[in-house]
Amino acid sequence: QQLAEFVNTPHKNALLLTALHQNFNAYASKLDASQKNEWTKVKGRFQEIVFAEPVEHLLYMAAESMANKYPVDVKQANAIYEIARQTKFVSPALTGEVMRGLYPLDAFSAVVLTKAIQKYGQNERSLFSFLNSKGANSLSDFRSAHNRTYNLSDVYDYIINNFHSYLSDVNEDSMGWSAILVAIERIETADWQDEDIMKSALEIVKVIGMLNLFGNAGFSMPH
């Protein structure tokens, strides 16, 4: 803050330019209220110029790194890509070839995961951490099956487990995440006769929640 104030004097004829790997507020996420207030003062001395790398570019790099790593169900990958394209969920710049390279991620899960990482993580670093991670909810631990990709429900679980500290703070998406949690709690506390149906209901709620949070303005939900 002192450095910013020093530079922010016209007669000094100086410019302070910094590069951050995440937004200003993210650095203060684990501070107490008093420290967050001080950090807000620091932020006020700067003008933020946000650079968001195109989702298509990040997914192209991811597809290149995943080449031949997983067996591809071409028919399934193409079918899901066509739905994503027709509903305008993906940009025309994102090709079917790239999507096949990302399998077992499908077109919806790949785009949502990347957008979430851009918002809550560290762009390329977080994306490639996901691609190479081990353990619960990871891609390496996922076993694809007939009619089963690493889908939006899986992405929801991964985001909740890996970005919980950020999501637990107030942010622009707080209401959306809260709505999903409320819906999940209602499902889990309902009287279900069939556990498999309950699991399916949970997956549907997670999918709808992810589409609502990360769908672009031109996206229309498929019927």
Pin down the residues of each PLM region:
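Terminal-proximal interaction/regulatory segments of ATP-powered molecular machines
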Residues: T189-H223
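Substrate-engagement module of ASCE P-loop NTPases
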Residues: Q2-L15, N37-F46
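Long, low-complexity, charged/polar intrinsically disordered regions in eukaryotic proteins
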Residues: S129-D194
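Generic, well-ordered alpha-helical scaffold segments in large soluble proteins
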Residues: Q2, F6, S65-N68, A116, ...
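Amphipathic alpha-helical segments of the small helical/lid subdomains adjacent to P-loop NTPase cores
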Residues: Y27-F142
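Structural recognition of the conserved hydrophobic beta-strand(s) that form the central parallel beta-sheet
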Residues: K12-A26
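Active-site-adjacent bridging/hinge elements
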Residues: E82-V90, V98-P104, D173-I184, G218-P222
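Secondary-structure capping and boundary motifs in well-ordered enzyme cores
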Residues: G101, L105, G176, D196-I204
